[in-house]
Regions:
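Gram-negative outer-membrane beta-barrel transporters
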Residues: 438-582, 586-597
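Extracytoplasmic gating/loop element in the C-terminal half of outer-membrane beta-barrel translocons
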Residues: 586-690, 697, 722-750
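Hydrophobic, lipid-facing positions within transmembrane beta-strands of outer-membrane proteins
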Residues: 58-62, 107-113, 129, 175-181, ...
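Residue-level signature of outer-membrane beta-barrel architecture
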Residues: 66-68, 117, 185-187, 198, ...
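Short loop/turn motifs that connect adjacent beta-strands in outer-membrane beta-barrel proteins
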Residues: 71, 121-122, 185-191, 281, ...
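Solvent-exposed loop/turn elements at secondary-structure boundaries
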Residues: 299-329, 333-494, 672, 690
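Transmembrane beta-barrel strands of outer-membrane/channel proteins
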Residues: 1-3, 76-80, 127-133, 194-200, ...
C-alpha cells in the first residue's frame, strides 16, 4: 500500500504583488455578476481563490505466486490506484474564482495473470492475460456559466468567474482486455521467440464543453456597459458580449442530456524474433512484427455534411469507418564485445516502431458528427443575454435563429494510420584513462504522425499585406467556405510523415576503491514536429498548431519538448563510521543543467481570418514597420506610447532584437538555462540475526538545494501562458495593441519547482 499527498503553492490571488490583474476592478466585476444572478433568481456565492494545488493518491496491490510444479509457475496480481489532482489555479495574468478550479479524478483497477511453463529442454512459454478498468472524470464547483473578462488592468490581466468550460461534463470510462503469448525455442546458438499481443478496448466518453454556457467580454468597459443595460432593461444589451458558447446534447436523438460517445476497437499483433549468438563476442537480433488495428463501430451519418463534402471534392464522411490495414515493423540490432571483456562494446540497431493513437482523438469523430450535439457560437449579437442559471442556457433568445444548428464536425481520413517511427541508434561503450565511457547517437524519423485541418476555412488568394498595406507580412488570408450552412468548424484528422529528432550523448563514469563514485554526461538534442497534439480535443490541437504561413498545412517547427542541451553530473561517497561495516554513510550531490522550455510568440486575436484565436505566429517588426502599424489606444496607453514601448522592448529582448523583420518561428527560442543541485545523505545500520541481515536506513534528500542557500539559485522558468505560447501583441478590428511598458516580461520563476524541497525517508529491509 502506498499513500501520497503533495501540495503545490499558488502564489497569485486577489491583490497579490506582481499580478497583472487590477484587484479593485476584479472585485467590482464579481459583485456585478452576483447582482445580475440575484436579479435572475439565482444565488451565486463565488469568491476569488488561490488555494494550494493538491495532488494525492492511494495505491494498493496484492500478488500471489504459485509454483504449481517444476515446470509451471502461476502469478496473479491485482492493483488499485485512486488518484486526484487539482487544476485551474490562477497565475500572474489570471484571477479565478474557486469554482473555476476543477479536480481530476482517476480510478484504475488492474488484474493480471501470468503462466510460465517449461514445455521441454528447448521450449518455454509465457502466457499473460489482463483486464484494466479505468474511470476518469473532471469535477468543478457548483454549476455556473464560465465568464471571462480580458484586459482587467493595463497589463492584459483577465478574470475567470464560474466553472472551467471543459469541466462542465467531462468523463472517460475505459475497459482494456489484453492477451499475450510468447513461445521461445532454444535451437543451438539461436533463441527464437514467436508470439502474439492483442488488446481489446471499450470506451465511453462524456464530453460536453460549455454545457452551462460560456461568455467572453473583451474588456471591463464592455462588461460594465452590459451591466448597466441589464439593470435598465435596455434592448440590444448583447452587443457587448464578444463571444458566447453553448453546447448541448440533442435529447430527441440521444435520449440523454449527458450523452456519451461509445465505441470499441482492438489491436492484434504477431511477431517473430531471432537472437543469434554468432560468436562469444557478436550477437545479432532481428525480427518482424505485424500489428492490425480493428474498429468495431462507425460514427453516425450526417447526410447534409456528406453531400456537401462530396460536392466540394472532399473524401470525408462522418460515417467513415477506419480501414484495418496491417502495419509492418521490421527490426534488426547487434552487439559486439571486442574481447568479451566489456572493454569495447559496439551496439546499435534500426527498425520501425508502431504506437497507438490516443483513442480520445478518434472519439471526437463519434461525439461530433453534428447529429448528437448542437453547438452555439455567437459573436456580438444583440440577441445574446447573459443567463446565469446554468440550467436555462437553452432559453437564450439567439438559439432560436442566429446560430441554431451550428455544428462542429470531426472527421478522419478513411486511411488514417496509427503512429509509426523509423528509429536507429549506434552506441559505443569503452574504457580509457581508467574511466568508463559511453557515446551514443539516436535518430528518429516520422513515418506516420497526426495533424489537423479545419476545412470549413480556405485561402482567399490574398495576403494580410494585400488587405492592410503592411506589405512585409505576406501570410495567406482565410475565409469561411460554409457560410449559410450549419457547419461552423470541420476538423479533419490526417497523417503526415514530417518530423524527426536526433540526439548525441557522451557519458563518463568512474568508481574509486575508497567509496567515491563520479558520473557526468552531456546530451545534445534537436526535435522537430508538425503538430504538438497535446490536447484531447481536435479544435485545440488545430488551434495550438501555431503557424506563420498556412493554417491547414503547417510548416515543420521545433517540438514543444525540444531541449537542445542537457548536462548531468553526480558524486556519491560511501564510508563506514569508525570502520564499522554495520554503519554505512552515503553522501551525494546530483546536478542537472538543461536548456529552458521552448516558447513561441504569437498574436492574441485572429490575424488571418481562419477562426483560430492565438495560432498566428508574430512578425517581429522593424522600427520603420512599427511606424506604419495602426494601434488602438486604451487607458494611459496612447497609440504613440505603444509604438515607443514596443520598439524599446524589441530592441532589448535577446532573441527578438536579432530577428527584426522576420517571423517568430514555432518554439524557436528557449527560456534561460536552468541549473539544479540535489543533496542526498543516508545512514544505514545493519545487524545479522542468525542467517538473516536486517537493515534500517534513514535518509534525507534536499531537492534543489541551491535555492536553500540562495533564493535566486535553482530557478525554473515558465511563461505563465498556456503551452508556452506568449501573446504580447493583440490584433482586433484591424488594429494592434501593446499594453505594456518596455519591461514586458516573458519569463517567470515557477513557484513549486523553483523552491527547495526536503524529504525524509526510512527504509527497513530484511
Amino acid at each position: 500500500y502506498e499513500k501520497s499527498n503533495k501540495e503545490y503553492p499558488n502564489n497569485y490571488g486577489l491583490g497579490t504583488g506582481g499580478s497583472k490583474v487590477d484587484a479593485d476592478l476584479a472585485v467590482k466585476i464579481l459583485d456585478a455578476v452576483k447582482d445580475m444572478a440575484q436579479r435572475q433568481g439565482y444565488d451565486y456565492n463565488g469568491v476569488y481563490a488561490n488555494p494550494d494545488m493538491r495532488t494525492w493518491s492511494n495505491k494498493a496491490s496484492v500478488k500471489l505466486d504459485w509454483n504449481i510444479n517444476d515446470f509451471n509457475k502461476l502469478s496473479v496480481r491485482w492493483s488499485y490506484v485512486n488518484a486526484r489532482s487539482m487544476k485551474g489555479g490562477g497565475g500572474i495574468a489570471t484571477l479565478n474564482t474557486g469554482d473555476h478550479i476543477y479536480e481530476y479524478m482517476s480510478n484504475t483497477n488492474t488484474i493480471m495473470a501470468e503462466l510460465q511453463s517449461r514445455l521441454s529442454p528447448v521450449l518455454s512459454n509465457e502466457l499473460r492475460a489482463s483486464y484494466v478498468m479505468v474511470r476518469d472524470a473532471r469535477t468543478s464547483g457548483t454549476p455556473f456559466p464560465a465568464i471571462q473578462i480580458s484586459k482587467v488592468g493595463n497589463n492584459n490581466g483577465s478574470v475567470n468567474i464560474g466553472n472551467e468550460y471543459n469541466s462542465m461534463a467531462n468523463g472517460l470510462d475505459q475497459d482494456v482486455f489484453t492477451f499475450e503469448d510468447n513461445l521461445t525455442w532454444y535451437k543451438g546458438n539461436h533463441t527464437i521467440t514467436m508470439g502474439t499481443h492483442n488488446e481489446v478496448y471499450s470506451f465511453s466518453n462524456l464530453f460536453i464543453p460549455n454545457l452551462f454556457g460560456s461568455y467572453y467580454f473583451q474588456n471591463p468597459d464592455d462588461f460594465f456597459s452590459y451591466y448597466e443595460g441589464f439593470k435598465a432593461g435596455t434592448p440590444g444589451i448583447g452587443k457587448y458580449i464578444n463571444q458566447y458558447y453553448f453546447q448541448q446534447a440533442n435529447v430527441d436523438v440521444t435520449g440523454n442530456a449527458r450523452w456519451r460517445a461509445k465505441f470499441g476497437s482492438a489491436q492484434v499483433g504477431f511477431y517473430i524474433q531471432d537472437k543469434w549468438d554468432i560468436s562469444n563476442s557478436l550477437q545479432l537480433t532481428y525480427g518482424l512484427r505485424m500489428d492490425l488495428p480493428l474498429f468495431f463501430d462507425t460514427p453516425s451519418e450526417n447526410a447534409p455534411f456528406n453531400e456537401w463534402a462530396a460536392q466540394n471534392g472532399y473524401g470525408y464522411r462522418t460515417n467513415n469507418k477506419l480501414n484495418s490495414t496491417p502495419m509492418w515493423s521490421p527490426r534488426v540490432g547487434f552487439r559486439w564485445d571486442k574481447d568479451n571483456r566489456h572493454k569495447l562494446i559496439v551496439r546499435g540497431g534500426v527498425g520501425i516502431f508502431t504506437g497507438r493513437v490516443p483513442f480520445v482523438w478518434l472519439s471526437n469523430s463519434f461525439s461530433n458528427t453534428g447529429i448528437q450535439m448542437s453547438s452555439y457560437n455567437v459573436k456580438r449579437n444583440d440577441k445574446i443575454t447573459l443567463i446565469l442559471d446554468p440550467n436555462k442556457q437553452a432559453e437564450n433568445g439567439q438559439l432560436l435563429n442566429a446560430s441554431s444548428g451550428n455544428q462542429t464536425i470531426n472527421v478522419f481520413d478513411k486511411d488514417f494510420k496509427f503512429a509509426q517511427n523509423l528509429r536507429a541508434n549506434l552506441g559505443v561503450d569503452f574504457k580509457a584513462l581508467g574511466i568508463d565511457w559511453t557515446a551514443e547517437a539516436i535518430y528518429s524519423k516520422t513515418l506516420n504522425d497526426v495533424y489537423y485541418q479545419n476545412i470549413a476555412y480556405a485561402e482567399t488568394g490574398k495576403t494580410f499585406g494585400d488587405i492592410t498595406g503592411m506589405y512585409w507580412d505576406n501570410r495567406p488570408m482565410y475565409e469561411r467556405v460554409t457560410k449559410g450552412l450549419p457547419f461552423s468548424n470541420i476538423y479533419a484528422l490526417k497523417n503526415s510523415n514530417k518530423g524527426y529528432s536526433y540526439s548525441l550523448s557522451l557519458k563518463a563514469e568512474k568508481s574509486f576503491d575508497f567509496g567515491l563514485d563520479l558520473a557526468a554526461s552531456y546530451t545534445f538534442t534537436q526535435s522537430k514536429s508538425l503538430c504538438p497534439a497535446t490536447s484531447s480535443q481536435a479544435s485545440s490541437n488545430w488551434n495550438n498548431t501555431s503557424t506563420y504561413r498556412f493554417s491547414n498545412a503547417p510548416e515543420l517547427g521545433y517540438s514543444a519538448y525540444n531541449l537542445p542541451h542537457m548536462i548531468k553530473a553526480s558524486a556519491f561517497y560511501r564510508f563506514h563510521i569508525a570502520n564499522n561495516k554495520n554503519f554505512t554513510t552515503t553522501i551525494g550531490v546530483i546536478y542537472q543543467g538543461r536548456s529552458g522550455s521552448p516558447y513561441s510568440m504569437l498574436y492574441s486575436g485572429d490575424l488571418n481570418g481562419d477562426n483560430g484565436r492565438g495560432n498566428d505566429l508574430m512578425f517581429i517588426p522593424t522600427d520603420e514597420q512599427i511606424d506604419l502599424m495602426p494601434f488602438k489606444a486604451q487607458g494611459n496607453y496612447t497609440e504613440d506610447l505603444q509604438r515607443q514601448n514596443l520598439k524599446a522592448w524589441l530592441a532589448k529582448t535577446p532573441y527578438l532584437k536579432d530577428h527584426r523583420g522576420e517571423y517568430f518561428k514555432r518554439n524557436a527560442d528557449n527560456l534561460p538555462f536552468e541549473n539544479h543541485f540535489d543533496f542526498h545523505v543516508a545512514e544505514k545500520m545493519s545487524v545479522k540475526v542468525g542467517k538473516q541481515v536486517h537493515a534500517l536506513e534513514l535518509s534525507l534528500d534536499i531537492l534543489n538545494v541551491g535555492n536553500l542557500l540562495n533564493k535566486d539559485w535553482g530557478r525554473t522558468y515558465g511563461t505563465n501562458y498556456s503551452n508556452e505560447l506568449i501573446s504580447p501583441l493583440t490584433y482586433d478590428g484591424g488594429k494592434f495593441q501593446f499594453l505594456s511598458t518596455p519591461d514586458y516580461v516573458i519569463k517567470y520563476p515557477q513557484s513549486y519547482y523553483s523552491r527547495w524541497r526536503g524529504q525524509l525517508g526510512l527504509k527497513y529491509t530484511f
